Amino acid sequence: MKSKTHLGHTARKRFGQNFLHDNNIIQNIVMAIYPQKEQFLVEIGPGLGALTEPVAEKVERLTVIELDRDLAERLRHHPFLHQKLNVIEYDAMQFNFEQLYIDENLAEKNQKLRVFGNLPYNISTPLMFHLFKYHAIIQDMHFMLQKEVVKRLCAAPNSKAYGRLTIMAQYFCQVLPVLEVPPTAFKPAPKVESAVVRLIPHKELPYPVKDLYWLNRVTTQAFNQRRKTLRNALSTLFSAEKLTALAIDLEARAENLSIADYARLANYLADNPPTEDLQSE
C-alpha cells in the first residue's frame, strides 16, 4: 500500500494533496522561477514547504496562501523561515490578489506579483481562470500542473488539445512549458504525469475584447459542441450570413479558429448583443 504520509503529514484527498520531494526537480523549478531578493513572490498551496524553503532563502519575504489549517499552522512555526513567511490561511480561488497588491504598496515600488505553486490538480483550471482576472498586476506565474493541462495551455489551433482553456490562457499570457515531472517525484504518487508551465501576462493584450463575457460565451458554446460545425454550434448567436461576413468558414469547427477569430466574434457580440436566440439558418 502506498503511503499518503510525508514528513508527518497525511495527504488529504479533498485538498488534492501530492507532496513534491524530488530534490533535483525542486531545484530545477526554483531555477526556472529565478526568485530575486527584492521581488514580491506569492506561493499558492505551499504544502510541506518543498518549494517554499528554497524560494524563501532567496527573498526577503514570501507570502504563502494555504487552505489546509494544519499546514498553515506548521508554516507559521517553521523552525527557520517563520519570520520570513506571511502565511495567509485562505482559499486561493476566493482570494483578492488586487487587495494584496494594494496592501503591499507594490505600485509605488514599481513591482508586480510573482505567483507560483504546485497546484492541486482538481482546482488548477478554475484557479488559473481566477488569476487571469489579475493579469495586469502579475509579472509571471509558474505552476506544477497535470501534464495534459499544460499541453492544453500550450496548444495551437487545429489540434485536439486546443480548447477554451488554451484561448483564455493565451489571450492573457504568453505560455511556455518548462519541464516534465514523473509521478515518482511526489508522495503519494499521482496517477498522472505532471509538468511545470510558465505564464507571462501580456503587457498589452494582443487581441483585446470589449467585454470578456462574450469571449467566454462564444468559446464555451463553440467548444461544448466541438464536433459540430460552427454554423450549427453558434447558431443561437450568429446567422450563417453574419459568420460569413465575419470571415468565419461555416464548415469549420471550434478548434479551427484562432484567438484573433474568437476575439472578432466576441467584439461583434459586444456591439450587437442578440436580443433572443437566433434560429439556425
Swiss-Prot record:
InterPro entries found in the cross-reference section: KsgA/Erm (IPR001737), rRNA_Ade_diMease-like_C (IPR023165), rRNA_Ade_Mease_Trfase_CS (IPR020596), rRNA_Ade_methylase_Trfase_N (IPR020598), rRNA_adenine_dimethylase (IPR011530), SAM-dependent_MTases_sf (IPR029063)
UniProt-annotated binding residues for S-adenosyl-L-methionine: 18, 20, 45, 66, 91, 118
Subcellular location: Cytoplasm
GO CC annotation: cytosol
Principal cellular location given in the protein's record: cytoplasm
EC number of the protein: 2.1.1.182
Keywords annotated in UniProt: Cytoplasm, Methyltransferase, RNA-binding, rRNA processing, S-adenosyl-L-methionine, Transferase
Gene Ontology molecular functions: 16S rRNA (adenine(1518)-N(6)/adenine(1519)-N(6))-dimethyltransferase activity; RNA binding
Reaction(s) catalysed by this chain's protein: adenosine(1518)/adenosine(1519) in 16S rRNA + 4 S-adenosyl-L-methionine = N(6)-dimethyladenosine(1518)/N(6)-dimethyladenosine(1519) in 16S rRNA + 4 S-adenosyl-L-homocysteine + 4 H(+)
Gene3D superfamilies: Ribosomal RNA adenine dimethylase-like, domain 2, Vaccinia Virus protein VP39
Enzyme class: transferase
The family this protein is said to belong to: Belongs to the class I-like SAM-binding methyltransferase superfamily. rRNA adenine N(6)-methyltransferase family. RsmA subfamily.
NCBIfam families found in the cross-reference section: ksgA
Function: Specifically dimethylates two adjacent adenosines (A1518 and A1519) in the loop of a conserved hairpin near the 3'-end of 16S rRNA in the 30S particle. May play a critical role in biogenesis of 30S subunits.
Matching PANTHER family: DIMETHYLADENOSINE TRANSFERASE, DIMETHYLADENOSINE TRANSFERASE-RELATED
Protein name (record): Ribosomal RNA small subunit methyltransferase A
Organism field: Histophilus somni (strain 2336) (Haemophilus somnus)
